[in-house]
Amino acid sequence: MLLQISEPGAGVKPQRRLAVGIDLGTTHSLVATVRDEQTVVLGDAQGRVLLPSVVRYLGAGAIEVGYEAKARQAEDPENTFVSVKRYMGRGLGDLASHHGAPYRFVEGEGMVQFDTRAGRISPVQVSAEILKVLRDRAVAELGGELAGAVITVPAYFDEAQRQATKDAAKLAGLEVFRLLNEPTAAAVAYGLDNAAEGVYAVYDLGGGTFDISVLKLTRGVFEVLATNGDPALGGDDFDRAVYDWLLAQSGLNGLSSSDASLLLTASRAAKERLSEQTEATVDTMLSDGSRIVATLSRDTFAELTAGLVKKTLTPVRKALRDAGLAIDDIKGVVLVGGATRMPCIREAVAEFFQQTPLTDLDPDKVVALGAAMQANLLAGNRAGGDWLLLDVIPLSLGIETLGGLCEKIVPRNTTIPVARAQEFTTWKDGQTAMSIHVVQGERELVSECRSLARFELRGIPPMAAGAARIRVTYQVDADGLLNVTAAEQTSGVEARIEVKPSYGLSDAEVARMIEDSYLHARDDLEARRLQEQKVEAARLIEATESALTEDGGLLTEQELEVLVKGLQVLKGAMEGSDWQAIKNAADALNEASTEFAGRRMDHSIKAALTGQKLESLGV
């Protein structure tokens, strides 16, 4: 949300600091700034504001970026990298969905790398080259060094992907004020420019990812109600649909890398022309001299991509459900991303939301404009009425508790930055260490969530079970990066960890984690109840058996027999999977041992008072 506060170090400065907003996109990238109170996108020497997110490695240290690299893509596909954003923070095992890519993938340290004529190159390095060009463009246009930048990322980027983006910026010589979710950046641009109020949906279909955000806009306040999306769906998939159609029309298959790249470029061009005209003709000559000639109509294109269009609406429904809203509650729909220029997208969005979507701002530029506004604020250039934008985390962050349960500490869709704390205690007498397992996900059992990190808190003073107080704090910063601290309250002993996963979630995992939380909600609740009852039953059994060992002599034979029988029934119930049966057996044992507990208390008091004089007791 937007609040009347400022981040540390972002106060008003006596002189204006140069700051930019960068949309590091899958297909194109842009850089924008606030100049003379106007937010503008900066162009190159030829006046072009869009920089193709394409990098070509020539060897001997030579590199081409942007239009030059894109022009050579067809003839040198193995060394020319497009849509590299899809590989940020990913491991080799995550690339199953990227069949057909012409690159030579190799496993790197925590992230996939590309084998090129210039050696092994990581997606971070490729992204850094794009950022360098944007940085140089801004420096030349603004006439000075940059104080920093706000860089946008898809809302569904996890910690590893966000960290990879920050690493790329560092390589490019950029100070990152913060990372900002792309749909949220668009909302900043639309909300501030139009002073709009109400609940809005931001439909963001970029080259490689799809995001939907539901935001509540009021005067001076932007609150993100919910986010959802598909990290493996974007304009590239629509290009591929045209590509597959062209292959089918020509009867060809098994094209060489260069021919496949050439045809994919032609497919993208045809798709873009169909946004302006009703037909597009493809006429492409392959390396063997054969030609692929076909005319694609807008209607046929709509049929080819109907499944993809429909696929975008599933996350939209989930986001509305998460926000507790109906379609009628949405005042307007903002379109973001060049892919939203397609008529089939605009028609589908209009039909779903029963209203014409907003297209006042250029969908290619709107994200960069919003990022520039935020950068201007964080640079300290905006005096009076400053606002701060807070995003939300897309997946819940939790901790493993006894029985393999996931205790959610920061629920999904919580606004960030945020700090949440919860107290835990020890399970055994004299316990001096505790293992902290940090997890991410929506399921009730840790086995169904994603493990982020493990660390230990040592040096806990020996106490009776349940006496120690361990406070676990989760801090998520404005970039979505997590720090976890565990501290024992009486001694002050502390342990902490910064969570930076070695690589990110696969495309399938990101979509599955939220989907499964809905599909298995009832089963998960039953599983959680079962584990909770088993944990409580185990505690009761241990306590009862310990009491019988120490003070069993306080019971009659008949009373002892009742408690032993109760223990046997509870242990038998624990071998099954009926949580209610375990609870009933535990309740029965508790009730049967109530009188015994009272006698033990009386016995302990009597033993403590034996031999004491009244004066020593203050009587």
UniProtKB/Swiss-Prot annotation:
SUPFAM superfamilies: Actin-like ATPase domain, Heat shock protein 70kD (HSP70), C-terminal subdomain, Heat shock protein 70kD (HSP70), peptide-binding domain. GO terms for biological process: iron-sulfur cluster assembly. Keywords: ATP-binding, Chaperone, Nucleotide-binding. It holds the Pfam family HSP70. GO terms for molecular function: ATP binding; ATP hydrolysis activity; ATP-dependent protein folding chaperone; unfolded protein binding. InterPro entries: ATPase_NBD, Heat_shock_70_CS, HSP70_C_sf, HSP70_peptide-bd_sf, Hsp_70_fam, ISC_FeS_clus_asmbl_HscA. Chaperone involved in the maturation of iron-sulfur cluster-containing proteins. Has a low intrinsic ATPase activity which is markedly stimulated by HscB. Belongs to the heat shock protein 70 family. This is Chaperone protein HscA homolog. It comes from Methylococcus capsulatus (strain ATCC 33009 / NCIMB 11132 / Bath). The gene is hscA.
